[in-house]
């Protein structure tokens, strides 16, 4: 009887860990989708598809800053190998090259800090955003996989 209780407790703990890991994956996906949505809004302004909107730019930069702060915690070792829903998943390199990944995060955070406060109009938006977007793309090329 004691053995059954121990096994049942171990299974319950394992199931709880899997649920916690899946919740972490969902939080990561939500953070990245929101960041992407804001990047898309800025890109539309740069391309002339939407009018310049300083409030939207400021809100996007706040979101980018929030993402930069959270990124170091969004990919814990416990989430390695999980297959999230959606079009993208983290590449194994996130965990295999942790130092390189952390360097990309630091570069992104620096690009956000360098950009924040400098964008005042469409011209400064066009000048300041490409280096920041380059940081996003560089990390995605190395540490993100497209499914399918």
Question: Which sequence ranges carry the predicted segments?
Answer:
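Sec/Tat signal peptide C-region and signal peptidase I cleavage site
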Residues: 16-20
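Sec-dependent signal peptide recognition
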Residues: 2-8
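Sequence context surrounding c-type heme c attachment/ligation sites in exported
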Residues: 21-148
């Amino acid at each position: 009887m004691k053995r059954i209780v121990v096994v049942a407790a171990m299974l319950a703990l394992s199931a709880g860990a899997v649920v916690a890991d899946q919740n972490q994956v969902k939080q990561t996906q939500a953070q990245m989708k929101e960041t992407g949505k804001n990047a898309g809004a800025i890109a539309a302004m740069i391309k002339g598809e939407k009018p310049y909107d300083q409030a939207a730019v400021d809100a996007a930069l706040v979101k980018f800053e929030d993402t930069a702060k959270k990124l170091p915690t969004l990919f814990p070792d416990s989430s390695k190998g999980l297959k999230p829903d959606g079009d993208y998943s983290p590449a194994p390199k996130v965990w295999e090259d942790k130092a390189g990944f952390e360097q990309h995060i630091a570069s992104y955070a620096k690009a956000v800090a360098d950009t924040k406060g400098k964008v005042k109009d469409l011209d400064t938006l066009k000048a300041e955003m490409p280096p920041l977007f380059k940081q996003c793309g560089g990390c995605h090329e190395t540490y993100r996989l497209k499914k399918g």
